[in-house]
């Protein structure tokens, strides 16, 4: 029992003095194809949402059920993204930061504090704080995680309809054996990230 307790994350203590807090998370840093997608969410403290958790720990059915509830009950939400071309120009870390900035800029309500999942924050015009494992500890980040995950998954399913031979609906563009095999057999498509090593290799681009 004691061993289990040591693994539990400490509860997040919200900084004092802020009235409007946004949570931000990203999905799609690892895939070889498509946009990196981020979301920013400001929840309504008077209208709580049950069952928020890190999107990766929820079933697809649960994520799809929570999405409209988050969109309806949140005070504001927005999606930001960077394209494969931008990822190739900037690198994936910088592109993720830009996508997060775009999500925050898209909020109809301006937060006075932004909580970011992970260990670094993009440059923002308001206070911000990085929260390690924030998608498990901060409701606003959990909600952002769900929106970003559903949006990106749906985009991969649409891409799968255009290019069924790649199996994007199954692996969502991540570097799986099935994806590598498809690249070897069919080459790369416009939406592939040309700066990622497996794609470079397929294109015959030397490091």
From Swiss-Prot:
Its cofactor is Mn(2+); Mg(2+). Manganese or magnesium. Binds 1 divalent metal ion per monomer in the absence of substrate. May bind a second metal ion after substrate binding. It holds the Pfam family RNase_HII. GO terms for cellular component: cytoplasm; ribonuclease H2 complex. Residues 19-207 form the RNase H type-2 domain. Gene3D superfamilies: Ribonuclease H-like superfamily/Ribonuclease H (3.30.420.10). Its EC number is 3.1.26.4. It is found in: Cytoplasm. It catalyses: Endonucleolytic cleavage to 5'-phosphomonoester. GO terms for molecular function: manganese ion binding; RNA binding; RNA-DNA hybrid ribonuclease activity. InterPro entries: RNase_HII (IPR022898), RNase_HII/HIII (IPR001352), RNase_HII/HIII_dom (IPR024567), RNaseH-like_sf (IPR012337), RNaseH_sf (IPR036397). Its main location: cytoplasm. Keywords: Cytoplasm, Endonuclease, Hydrolase, Manganese, Metal-binding, Nuclease. A divalent metal cation binds at residues 25-26, 117. GO terms for biological process: DNA replication, removal of RNA primer; mismatch repair. HAMAP family: RNase_HII_B (MF_00052_B). Belongs to the RNase HII family. Endonuclease that specifically degrades the RNA of RNA-DNA hybrids. This is Ribonuclease HII. It comes from Vibrio vulnificus (strain YJ016). The gene is rnhB.
């Amino acid at each position: 029992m004691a061993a289990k307790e040591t693994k539990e994350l400490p509860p997040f203590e919200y900084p004092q003095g802020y009235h409007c807090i946004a949570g931000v998370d990203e999905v799609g840093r690892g895939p070889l194809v498509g946009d990196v997608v981020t979301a920013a969410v400001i929840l309504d403290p008077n209208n709580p949402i049950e069952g928020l958790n890190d999107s990766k720990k929820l079933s697809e059915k649960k994520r799809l059920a929570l999405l409209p509830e988050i969109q309806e009950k949140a005070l504001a939400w927005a999606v930001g993204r960077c394209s494969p071309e931008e990822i190739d120009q900037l690198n994936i870390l910088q592109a993720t930061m830009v996508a997060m900035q775009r999500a925050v800029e898209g909020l109809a309500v301006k937060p006075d504090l932004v909580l970011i999942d992970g260990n670094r924050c993009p440059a923002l015009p308001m206070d911000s704080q990085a929260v390690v494992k924030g998608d498990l500890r901060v409701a606003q980040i959990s909600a952002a995680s769900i929106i970003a995950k559903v949006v990106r998954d749906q985009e991969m399913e649409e891409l799968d309809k255009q290019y069924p031979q790649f199996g994007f609906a199954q692996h969502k563009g991540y570097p799986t054996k099935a994806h590598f095999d498809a690249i070897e057999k069919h080459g790369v498509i416009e939406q592939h990230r040309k700066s990622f090593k497996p794609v470079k290799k397929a294109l015959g681009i030397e490091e």
